């Protein structure tokens, strides 16, 4: 009646290491993208002033062009990395407002 016991000594260590490496690479990639996106937003925000945009955009966005969060404005591309809410809950770096 001892057939239900599992023997974990036969687990292939190569496959275990391979899985750990894949997970580490994925997590590192997400962290690197987040850091680079955040740094890019800081540099862009420091380099733009209210004089860089016209009256129409100032009324529409009330700030620098790259940070315009209106969906109908296609003249100002957004920069940075959008982090899905299920990966980092409570951390909003994308500055997007839900409609």
UniProtKB/Swiss-Prot annotation:
Residues exposed to the Intravirion side: 41-99
Subunit structure: Dimer.
GO molecular function ontology, one term from the record: channel activity
Glycosylation site list: 3, 7
UniProt topology in membrane: Single-pass type III membrane protein
Family: Belongs to the influenza viruses type B glycoprotein NB family.
Protein name: Glycoprotein NB
Record's keyword annotation contains Transmembrane: yes
Virion surface side: 1-18
GO cellular component, one term: host cell membrane
Transmembrane segments: 19-40
Organism: Influenza B virus (strain B/Memphis/3/1989)
Chloroplast is among the record's keywords: no
Pfam families on file: NB (PF04159)
This protein's encoding gene: NB
Gene Ontology BP term (one): proton transmembrane transport
UniProt keyword list: Glycoprotein, Hydrogen ion transport, Ion channel, Ion transport, Membrane, Signal-anchor, Transmembrane, Transmembrane helix, Transport, Viral ion channel, Virion
Protein function: Putative viral proton channel. May play a role in virus entry.
Subcellular location: Virion membrane
């Amino acid at each position: 009646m001892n057939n239900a016991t599992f023997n974990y000594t036969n687990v292939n260590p190569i496959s275990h290491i391979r899985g750990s490496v894949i997970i580490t690479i994925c997590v590192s990639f997400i962290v690197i993208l987040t850091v680079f996106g955040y740094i890019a937003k800081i540099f862009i925000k420091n380099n733009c002033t209210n004089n860089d945009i016209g009256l129409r955009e100032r009324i529409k966005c009330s700030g620098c062009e790259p940070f315009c969060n209106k969906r109908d404005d296609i003249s100002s591309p957004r920069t940075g990395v959008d982090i899905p809410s299920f990966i980092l809950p409570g951390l909003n770096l994308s500055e997007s407002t839900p409609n």
